[in-house]
Amino acid sequence: MKERNKRVLVGMSGGIDSTATCLMLQEQGYEIVGVTMRVWGDEPQDARELAARMGIEHYVADERIPFKETIVKNFIDEYKQGRTPNPCVMCNPLFKFRVLAEWADKLDCAYIATGHYSRLEERSGHIYIVAGDDDKKDQSYFLWRLGQDILKRCIFPLGDYTKIKVREYLAEKGYEAKSKEGESMEVCFIQGDYRDFLREQCPELDTEIGPGWFVNSEGVKLGQHKGAPYYTIGQRKGLEIALGKPAYVLKINPQKNTVMLGDAEQLQTEYMLAEQDRIVDEQELFSCENLAVRIRYRSRPIPCRVKRLEDGRLLVRFRETASAVAPGQSAVFYDGRRVLGGAFIASQRGIGLVIIENKDKL
């Protein structure tokens, strides 16, 4: 009879990180079951061959249709709405870890493991996500939406490693060719520019939305753009407009198909609204003296304070100015390296009145 509490289901892409994860867990005495989610592209031949070499069970979960109907659709819809999505943040709870949990239950595996560069810490009855030791590879930012039920089953073996050490480990274990492979794509279903992907998947963008106007903060037209979905807050390159000085995207209005341009100073803000949050312990978040927030992947955490508004949203006050706050991106809150929770950056419309009403309460 198989010992369930030693069976681990590993999300196995066939890349460097999932290969190292399998080998490390095997060394620790776990029985490994590999599942490769096919969400885009070709058959996962690499993963099959690696599983055979390691002598582990391997299955392929063909999730191409539901992945396209949920994650890819959301990605396109967010850009249509003038927001800047992060598909990994959406995928992890809605898709990746949900599917892995379903397969783990089906295959009688107690645990789920992935090659994320993050750690877990149990404190006061809660499981917290903790930033991985490799600051350049840390993926805690992408995991804030995972619930306690999933985190209790998760193992992240690479959290204590740097990418260099993982490559060295694979080479030592006889996987030298694998250790020299390049990095995986940042967004698994996009090769190249996301704008080309939008046009390919949603050709009506150019016919139904089409070109619109760049405007300044007074609403004066500055020139034409290719369509609001093709721009992001803070963007400077690729605007294809000459104003005699550097210009940045300040706001996007999908209803009017306008893109507001301005200078770098106009991107600065001391406040931000966030919504659809998941917080581990609200009392801890609101009272934390060392609280800091990341407003995009790999950005430096900015010291802040947070308040819950009556409408359920969060008002974040930065202790130093932040730049290019982009609706749709994630705001992930940290106490040191420990994730206390996260939220989606909301539309900042009407924030002036909110600030006036709450300025003395933060």
Swiss-Prot record:
EC number(s) reported in the record: 2.8.1.13
Disulfide bridge positions per record: C91-C188
UniProt GO cellular component terms: cytoplasm
Residues the record lists as binding ATP: G11, M12, S13, G14, G15, I16, D17, S18, M37, G115
Protein name (record): tRNA-specific 2-thiouridylase MnmA 3
Region (Interaction with tRNA): 137-139, 296-297
The encoding gene: mnmA3
Pfam families assigned: tRNA_Me_trans, tRNA_Me_trans_C, tRNA_Me_trans_M
Keyword Disulfide bond annotated: yes
